Amino acid sequence: MAGIAATPWGTDHAWMDLVTVPPRPATLVEALKESRRALEPPPPDPSGARDGSRLDALRRSLRSHKVTGMVVPRADAHQGEFVASNAERLAWLTGFTGSAGVAVVTPRCAALFVDGRYTLQAAEQVNTGLWDIVPLAHTSVNDWLAKTLARGDKLGYDPWLHTVSEVDRRNRVCEKAGAQCVPLPVNPIDTLWQNRPPPPLGPVIPHPDMLAGWSSADKRQRIARDLRDAGATAMVITDPASLAWLLNIRGADVPFTPLPLGFGILHGDGAVDLFMDGRKLPRPVLAQLGPDITLRAPSALADALDTLGGQRRRVLLDADACAQWVRDRLSRAGASVRLGADPIALPKARKTPAELEGARAAHVRDGAALVRFLCWLDQEGPRGTQTEMSAVATLHALRAEAQQFRGPSFETISGAGPNGAIVHYRVTPETDRRIEPDMLYLVDSGAQYRDGTTDVTRTVPIGTPTREQIRRFTQVLKGHIALATVTFPRGTTGSHLDTLARVALWADGVDFEHGTGHGVGSYLGVHEGPQRISRRPSSVALDPGMIVSNEPGYYKTGAFGIRIENLVAVAPVTEPPAGAEIPLLRFETLTLAPIDRRLIDVAALTVAERTWLDAYHARVLREIGPLVDDDTRAWLAQATAPLAPETADGTGPEATPPAVPSASS
């Protein structure tokens, strides 16, 4: 039960199937919930991080391991975006709770590396008298090490927490400095961390073939064929998302993403050895997996890798995702290690027709909840009675009314006024800001449903927006529409299209620093690769079925933030222009929610841009209107009305917000 208590909530009653047999009387259900609450591990006490006692203890431990320093990433053995509570080693050591960061500890200094999202948060949470906060935009971890390491230094690391490619790059840095990278047999933090939460025991559930569109047996045969074509006879699967997709299962071991933590070995005949705690798999799931899936304890992975080595097997590993520990074990055992891309990644990214249908249904459902929220916000925002946190709670409650809802797909970004300018802002009780007139409010949120994953951002004026806010919002909208309406040939990558989202902003000499689009899974990760839309070069083409986000923005530090985000699916152009000589692709917009007309300078839009927005809004009203109450439908009709000609001063289509139902309605 302690392992169950270490998993996120939001898995309905599936976890109860691991400890009791249905049907369950209401009294038993409540007793189980109380037992789980009592066993939930408390968050790490930050006092030991702030007073330096943990840092001192780690340095003493490193001396006993005969190393002079250590790299501590926010990572687990699976290299995922979200980690279980027992893997929050960076937070335990430093007090920093952001979703990405790396610490380096040496006898002389301690540095915490964070990206631009977390510079302010790190400075607030970490004792800067003990730790140097290093922005990754200025100095990479390896560049810092190259300047800091001395000849003869031994830099320790946990080989479970670093990928093969990371270790290769770091080894080169150490060799150049005359130092060594030393894999540690045990992570010292695991020994020092008192009351560390147990490994999570989230229930594994089947993901029906009707939602996946492809049976696990067919998937395994397809990937096994690709494996053989690549000259390998087996592959080690360390990414839980790849494992979940391949076996048509989902889990509940980490926040926000329905992942079952475990490892797999796929053999050339399509059989899989699954290394996962058997307590997580109810009997119906075991039966669904079938005879070609052999369930083994996680502790058996080492022996299984030794067996592959003893058989001199050719084993494929993804160098960018696989832990160095796996390569070390295979190499020592005599296996021939082949490094290459995960062959599951692209098939997983190319959604089946069934997955696309699920995504469309999920977005209609999500759109209804979001429209109800935006209507509520239009009523409550000007009153100044709501805060960023109360808005998050309201939106969550509206989504949770859907039977298929399984929880948020990430922690909601609820940014009022200047907080909206922090790209990945996370509200806390200490930062919670009141939503009130004369500010912009940015809300970036998403949900997990049994049939799809959503991610959407809307920016709303509370009161009357300024001319500057209208200009910037309109520029962001023009970039959004440019990407939404583009047609492109097969083989086009996201880096080819990224410029479209930025040109209107560039005209004024401004830009946004984040990527324009990320891939999204099917009841899996809200951030999924390998596809993306970004300035960073990419060799991965945007293929039919891929889902990506379209989210240009603008951020004025200390003032406001703007982002417009829809999810889109890559689809063939079914009616190409006359004389077209090559097959073309387009984007199908999935997200359904109004884009605030009060922030649009209609005079700055082209006829084509106005036509697109009017058509999009008509679709939102058509598909969402029947799903909401009469008052919300009336509000939605105004929020999606065709754009009126620009006003005399060119400030936008209307000066007043849509009518909002009264509090009594």
Task: Kindly label every feature range from the protein language model.
Residues 2-665:
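Active-site neighborhoods and metal-handling regions in enzymes and metal-associated proteins
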